From Swiss-Prot:
The N-terminal region is intrinsically disordered. The gene is FBLIM1. This is Filamin-binding LIM protein 1. Keywords: Cell adhesion, Cell junction, Cell shape, Cytoplasm, Cytoskeleton, LIM domain, Metal-binding, Repeat, Zinc. The keyword Secreted does not apply. One of its GO terms (cellular component) is stress fiber.
Length: 373
C-alpha cells in the first residue's frame, strides 16, 4: 500500500482509510464523546455505531432471550499476507453517529419532584417501556420515593369485658284505651267504659262502692269513713257511743268519765247544774257528779273550833284532824289553856284530853291536880 491514503465508496458514503494508530485515536475520541453525552443525559442510551454488523445486531439471535440484545465480542483485526492490517473501520460523520430517533422509544420522564398525594397512588411503569430499556442495556429508573402514608394512627383500644351490662328490656306498650286503675274492693281492672267512683284516694266500680254493713249503694250519696271502710249514715251512727245520761248518740264533742261517754251539756253538777267540762269534779255516794264547791259544802267536815268546813284554800290541800269524834283544822288543833299547837304524834307534845277538852301534857297535869276541867 502506498503512503497516500486511498478513497473508496461504500454504501454511498465516503470512507477514508487510516493507519491502525489513527483508528485507535478515532475510537478513543468516539468513546470520550459518548461518555460526555452520557454524563449530560444519563437517561439516554449511547448511540450505536453503524457498522456492517448493525443490521445483524438489531435482530434477536435464536440463542438469546427475546427483548435483550446479544453481546458481541469484536474480532481481532485480520492480518494480510503482505504483513499489513486490514483497513480501519470507516469513520462516520456526525449524522451517521447519531441513532435514528424515530426507531428509539421516547426517553423516560424525569423523576417527579413533588411527592404524590395520599389519594393518588403512582401508576405502575408500562411493561413495554421496561422491555425497550432492557434492549438498550439500561436499567429501568427506580420508582419515585413515596412518602409514608400519614394516616390516622391506629392505637389499640382498651380491652372490654366479654360480658357487658345488657340494656333494660323495652317497656311493653300499653294498649290505647286500657286502664291501669284497680278497684279497691274487687281488685279487678276498672275499664274506662265503666262507671267508676273515686273516694278515699282509691278507685271503685260504681256497683262495688257500697256500705260495708248494709250493702247500700253509696255512689252519689253522703257516706262516713271509719277504719278505712265506707258506711252509710245510719250504720255509722250505730257505731257511735251513746250518752251515759240521756242515752242519745254522741255525734260532736264527747266527754269520757266513769267509763262512759257524755254530751258536754249532760255532764253537769247535780247541785248547781253547772257544766263541769274539763274541770275537776267529785262523786257522791251514788256516783253523783258534783263540782268541788258544792261537794265540799255538802260533804266537807266542819271544824269543831271555828265551825267552818275543812276544805282546800288557795289551791292548797286541807287536812282534817279527828280527835274524840271531832274534826279540827290543823291550825285549830291547839291546847285550850296555853294555845300551843298540838302534835298528831303520840309524844309529849301531843294532845292529852281531859273531859272532852284539849290540853297539852303540862296543862293536863295541872288540871288533873286541881281536880277541875
Amino acid at each position: 500500500m502506498a503512503s497516500k491514503p486511498e478513497k473508496r465508496v461504500a454504501s454511498s458514503v465516503f470512507i477514508t482509510l487510516a493507519p491502525p494508530r489513527r483508528d485507535v485515536a478515532v475510537a478513543e475520541e468516539v468513546r470520550q464523546a459518548v461518555c460526555e453525552a452520557r454524563r449530560g443525559r444519563p437517561w439516554e442510551a449511547p448511540a450505536p455505531m453503524k457498522t456492517p454488523e448493525a443490521g445483524l445486531a438489531g435482530r434477536p439471535s435464536p440463542w438469546t432471550t427475546p427483548g435483550r440484545a446479544a453481546a458481541t465480542v469484536p474480532a481481532a483485526p485480520m492480518q494480510l499476507f503482505n504483513g499489513g492490517c486490514p483497513p480501519p473501520p470507516p469513520v462516520l460523520d456526525g449524522e451517521d453517529v447519531l441513532p435514528d430517533l424515530d426507531l428509539l422509544p421516547p426517553p423516560p420522564p424525569p423523576p417527579p419532584v413533588l411527592l404524590p398525594s395520599e389519594e393518588e397512588a403512582p401508576a405502575p411503569m408500562g411493561a413495554s417501556l421496561i422491555a425497550d430499556l432492557e434492549q438498550l442495556h439500561l436499567s429501568p429508573p427506580p420508582p419515585p420515593p413515596q412518602a409514608p402514608a400519614e394516616g390516622p394512627s391506629v392505637q389499640p383500644g382498651p380491652l372490654r369485658p366479654m360480658e357487658e351490662e345488657l340494656p333494660p328490656p323495652p317497656a311493653e306498650p300499653v294498649e290505647k284505651g286500657a286502664s291501669t286503675d284497680i278497684c279497691a274492693f274487687c281488685h279487678k281492672t276498672v275499664s274506662p267504659r265503666e262507671l267508676a267512683v273515686e273516694a278515699m284516694k282509691r278507685q271503685y266500680h260504681a256497683q262495688c262502692f257500697t256500705c260495708r254493713t248494709c250493702r247500700r249503694q253509696l255512689a252519689g250519696q253522703s257516706f262516713y269513713q271509719k277504719d278505712g271502710r265506707p258506711l252509710c249514715e245510719p250504720c255509722y251512727q250505730d257505731t257511735l257511743e251513746r250518752c251515759g245520761k240521756c242515752g242519745e248518740v254522741v255525734r260532736d264533742h264527747i266527754i269520757r268519765a266513769l267509763g262512759q261517754a257524755f254530751h258536754p251539756s249532760c255532764f253537769t253538777c247535780v247541785t248547781c247544774a253547772r257544766c263541769i267540762g274539763d274541770e275537776s269534779f267529785a262523786l257522791g255516794s251514788q256516783n253523783e257528779v258534783y263540782c268541788l264547791d258544792d261537794f265540799y259544802r255538802k260533804f266537807a267536815p266542819v271544824c269543831s273550833i271555828c265551825e267552818n268546813p275543812i276544805i282546800p284554800r288557795d289551791g292548797k290541800d286541807a287536812f282534817k284532824i279527828e280527835c274524840m269524834g271531832r274534826n279540827f283544822h290543823e291550825n285549830c288543833y291547839r291546847c285550850e289553856d296555853c294555845r300551843i299547837l298540838l302534835s298528831v304524834e303520840p309524844t309529849d307534845q301531843g294532845c292529852y284530853p281531859l273531859n272532852n277538852h284539849l290540853f297539852c301534857k303540862p296543862c293536863h297535869v295541872k288540871r288533873s291536880a286541881a281536880g277541875c276541867c
